[in-house]
Structure formats: structure tokens, C-alpha cells
């Protein structure tokens, strides 16, 4: 199980927070990143049946209403094809949990826009119909999967196209994935592997097992340079679905003298900011760092991904139900 106590703290700081970071402003993406941790914790725009000390339903409602207002007639929320799938995931999650008909209309239009924007080669990039890159494609695949799980219409052939794209960036020798060409970038490998898992690839698939070895080498408890929240977010989902020793290694840390330590969950908890910095309300957040998209995404993205990563423990059921020899954590 995961220690979840810290998850309550960031939410209360997420909305009123004023950032001292120099991150580029993208209100669409920011709203998506702000909503997702609430939704992943089961908090929607509907008031909770049991009154808690703080009711975040109005905060979630405000974010959803903002996104619906921003959505174009073509279904695009704006902010580019990084922001659109991110927001689509949030809207699909909100609809899936509430069956709100207004959200259904918006979410289906958003899915339809993604289908329109997909390149013939199977991927997505910054503009509609542009030849894909693995990073944007990963968000789009998660959006389609969220829509499918919420009961929205997602044509099955779109996944076949995604497989075509993944094949084009997969390095069979290493088991890794590249950004636009075959490679073994750890972060792109995590994205590619998660997409494959969503496509139903067998957990014993040699390519997946090779990919696990790539991810183990960038475990932040083994390699401090591996502390990249974008990478950790995807890799945690991958390892969670793999289960067994792969998950134990990732979650609890490498084994030494019969014990595991420096697992991802403990590293994330230790890095949560405990106090404000002057006038800036940063308590409960995570520092953006410098790896990957951290500087452009800023503190909000780092905090959102950190929370979503820890919510994997109780939000996602492992895709692979078979026993693979690991501890039950």
C-alpha cells in the first residue's frame, strides 16, 4: 500500500497558488493538470455525499465550466495538442464518474477532434495531421483510453494506427522507444510501453521485459538523474501494470541484504515541500526541477504529476492479473 497522507495537502494549495517560476503560461493545460489529481482522488463537480472538512466540488466545477467555455465547435479545447489530450482525459474522467450529459457532449467532441487530428502514420504531434512524436502520442492514447473506459465512442481502428506508429519508433534490439525514430530514451520507452500495455500486449512480451530493464536503470533511487517527474509518471504506471519484481523494484526500491529501500513512493513523499516561501504558497507542492518538461511545465505540472503518480496505487487496477512473483505492495 502507499502512504497517502501527503495527498491532501497539495489540493488545498493547488488553485490559489501563485508561481514564482518562469514557466510559460498555458491556462488550458494548467487547468487540466489542476483537475486531474482531484478527479483521480474521486472528487468531482458533484458535492460529496459525506461532508468533509473541505468541499472541492466547486473548484472542480469551475475548472470544468472554464474548459467547456473554451472548447471550439470542432471539439478542440485549445492550447495545442499537448494541452488538448490532457484536458480530454480530465473531461472523460469527470464524465465516467458522474454520467453528466453536458460533460458527455464536451468529452465526445474532444475525442472526435483527436480522431480527426491523428496522422496517417498513427501518431500525433503539435498540429492536426502532423507526423507524430511519442510524447504527444502518449497523452492522446491515454485520452482515447479514458474515453473508451467512460463509454464514449472510440473507433477500434484508431488503436491499430497507434500500433503502426509505435512500431516505427521501437528499437527491437534494446526494447526501447524513441521520440520520432527508433531509440531507447527512458522517458519515451516508458510512454511507448504504457501504450503497448493499453493495446493488450502480453506482460511476458520480450520487448516489454527489455523495456523494464531500461527503466530500472533510471530509477531515481539508483540514478539521481532519473528524477524526472514526466518519466516517473509514465514509468510508475508501466511497472504497476507489470507487477511482480518489476513493481517491487520500482515501488519499494532495489534489494540489498534482503531489504528494499529508496523506492519511488518514499522518494516522492520526501520531496514534497513542507513550508511556504515568503509570500508564495508552495507548501504541499513539488519543486519543478530541470529534467524533461519540468521548467516549461512549472510547479503545477510537477505537483500534479507527483500526486497522480502516488494515486496510481489506488486509482489504477493492474492490467495484468497474473502473479509474477512480487510482494503485495
What is the predicted role of each segment?
Residues 1-329:
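Preference for long, amphipathic alpha-helical scaffolds in soluble/luminal domains
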Amino acid at each position: 500500500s502507499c502512504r497517502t497522507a501527503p495527498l491532501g495537502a497539495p489540493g488545498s494549495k493547488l488553485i490559489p497558488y501563485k508561481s514564482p517560476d518562469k514557466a510559460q503560461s498555458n491556462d488550458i493545460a494548467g487547468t487540466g493538470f489542476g483537475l486531474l489529481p482531484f478527479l483521480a482522488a474521486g472528487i468531482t463537480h458533484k458535492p460529496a455525499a459525506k461532508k468533509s472538512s473541505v468541499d472541492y466540488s466547486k473548484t472542480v466545477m469551475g475548472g470544468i465550466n472554464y474548459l467547456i467555455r473554451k472548447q471550439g465547435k470542432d471539439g478542440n479545447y485549445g492550447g495545442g495538442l499537448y494541452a488538448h489530450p490532457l484536458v480530454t482525459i480530465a473531461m472523460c474522467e469527470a464524465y465516467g464518474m458522474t454520467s453528466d450529459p453536458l460533460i458527455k457532449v464536451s468529452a465526445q467532441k474532444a475525442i472526435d477532434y483527436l480522431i480527426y487530428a491523428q496522422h496517417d502514420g498513427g501518431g500525433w504531434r503539435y498540429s492536426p495531421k502532423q507526423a507524430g512524436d511519442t510524447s504527444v502520442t502518449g497523452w492522446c492514447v491515454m485520452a482515447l483510453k479514458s474515453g473508451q473506459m467512460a463509454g464514449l465512442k472510440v473507433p477500434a481502428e484508431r488503436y491499430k494506427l497507434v500500433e503502426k506508429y509505435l512500431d516505427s519508433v521501437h528499437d527491437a534490439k534494446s526494447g526501447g522507444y524513441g521520440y520520432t525514430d527508433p531509440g531507447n530514451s527512458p522517458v519515451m520507452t516508458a510512454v511507448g510501453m504504457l501504450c503497448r500495455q493499453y493495446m493488450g500486449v502480453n506482460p511476458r512480451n520480450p520487448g516489454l521485459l527489455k523495456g523494464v530493464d531500461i527503466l530500472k536503470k533510471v530509477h531515481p533511487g539508483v540514478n539521481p538523474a532519473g528524477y524526472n517527474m514526466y518519466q516517473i509518471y509514465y514509468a510508475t504506471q508501466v511497472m504497476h501494470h507489470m507487477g511482480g519484481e518489476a513493481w517491487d523494484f520500482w515501488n519499494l526500491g532495489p534489494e540489498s541484504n534482503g531489504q528494499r529501500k529508496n523506492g519511488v513512493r518514499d522518494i516522492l513523499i520526501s520531496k514534497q515541500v513542507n513550508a511556504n516561501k515568503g509570500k508564495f504558497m508552495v507548501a504541499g507542492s513539488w519543486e519543478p526541477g530541470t529534467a524533461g518538461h519540468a521548467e516549461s511545465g512549472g510547479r503545477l505540472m510537477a505537483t500534479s504529476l507527483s500526486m497522480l503518480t502516488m494515486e496510481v496505487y489506488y486509482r489504477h487496477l493492474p492490467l495484468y492479473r497474473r502473479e509474477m512473483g512480487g510482494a503485495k505492495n
